[in-house]
Amino acid sequence: MRNEIEILARKELESANKKFSLFHSSHEGFAVLLEEAEELAEESNEIEKIMNSWWLYIRRDEDIDVQKKRVDRIRSRAVNAAMEAIQVIAMCDKFKMSL
């Protein structure tokens, strides 16, 4: 799986480099990397919120169809988090290329 992630990160870096120039300073690189890291954290936080609220309802025997909808939301957020993590990796690589 690690190899596949590295391939996706390389593709993301290539795409980003076609759209945007290399970073002009450490400050710029930091800001871009911070934004991507914050977006990753936001997705993770949303998963945690869903899990916490789910636990409250699961103890009350929540309907399985409602639980499946919660799992769909968790899955969607996890996919988003994976995409953000790949962007973090790509921006780390871009930083090293830039400076």
Go through the PLM ranges and name each one.
Residues 1-99:
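Flexible "arm" and connector segments at domain edges
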